[in-house]
């Protein structure tokens, strides 16, 4: 019996991976760092603490990690204020699921980005709890952010369903002992063997209905 549905944000509700990628690339290039071919995929699911350290340590950005994070986040927020890149069908899916279960959100995005995205989408009132990876010890694929969401909602992980798109996100939900519904990221598709561990694999978020969880 699923009592709570915990959504990821980037790639599930908001098509923002390209904006994060663009903003990080700009900071690397403008400060004299060097972008690596595997950088985008390596940072999927990382918390802000982790990816800002990655830009500093691996990509050679000569700024303190806190400043790197603040600079990237401000650029992403500026894009959101111009136009929030919602995944088609995301708002309707959130509203459908809110009629069936309590909702939470567990994201690698920074707190200001989470709050802005949900407010601009006008669904912030539907989520009981939202957790940023910067508020826990470890980012995805560690289970911390999902376990913290369950703790704040006062529910057992066993009655939670996770809605995820990325390999690290799926691993995080599975490690938390939760039911995972995968909507594979079309740009960085999770490996087939990992998708087989999900309770359901959907083509798009339009396919997410309460019946999927029964």
Where are these regions (language model features)?
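Active-site neighborhood of HAD-like aspartate-dependent phosphohydrolases
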Residues: 1-42
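Asp-based, Mg2+/Mn2+-dependent phosphohydrolase catalytic module
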Residues: 1-3, 95, 111-214
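Conserved phosphate-coupling serine/threonine residues in phosphotransfer and NTP-handling enzymes
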Residues: 12, 107-109, 184
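Conserved SAM-binding loop
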Residues: 13, 86, 103-106, 138, ...
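Helix-loop "lid/cap" segments that line or gate small-molecule binding pockets
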Residues: 25-28, 47-62, 117, 150
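Metal-dependent phosphoesterase signature
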Residues: 34, 54-92
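Short, acidic loop-to-helix structural element flanking the phosphoryl-transfer center
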Residues: 78-105, 111-115
């Amino acid at each position: 019996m699923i009592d709570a549905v915990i959504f990821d944000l980037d790639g599930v509700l908001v098509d923002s991976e390209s904006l994060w990628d663009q903003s990080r690339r700009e900071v690397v290039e403008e400060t004299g760092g060097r972008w690596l071919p595997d950088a985008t995929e390596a940072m999927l699911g990382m918390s802000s603490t982790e990816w800002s350290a990655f830009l500093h340590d691996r990509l050679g950005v000569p700024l303190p990690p806190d400043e790197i994070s603040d600079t990237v986040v401000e650029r992403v927020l500026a894009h959101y204020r111009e136009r929030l890149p919602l995944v088609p069908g995301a708002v309707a899916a959130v509203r459908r699921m809110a009629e069936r279960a309590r909702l939470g959100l567990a994201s690698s995005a920074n707190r200001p980005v989470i709050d802005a995205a949900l407010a601009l989408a006008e669904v912030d009132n539907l989520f009981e709890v939202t957790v940023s990876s910067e508020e826990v010890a470890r980012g995805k694929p560690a289970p911390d952010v999902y376990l913290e969401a369950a703790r704040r909602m006062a529910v057992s992980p066993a009655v939670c369903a996770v809605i995820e798109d990325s390999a690290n996100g799926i691993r995080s939900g599975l490690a938390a002992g939760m039911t995972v519904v995968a909507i594979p990221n079309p740009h960085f598709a999770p490996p087939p063997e990992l998708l087989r561990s999900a309770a359901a694999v959907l083509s798009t978020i339009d396919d997410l209905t309460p019946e999927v969880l029964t």
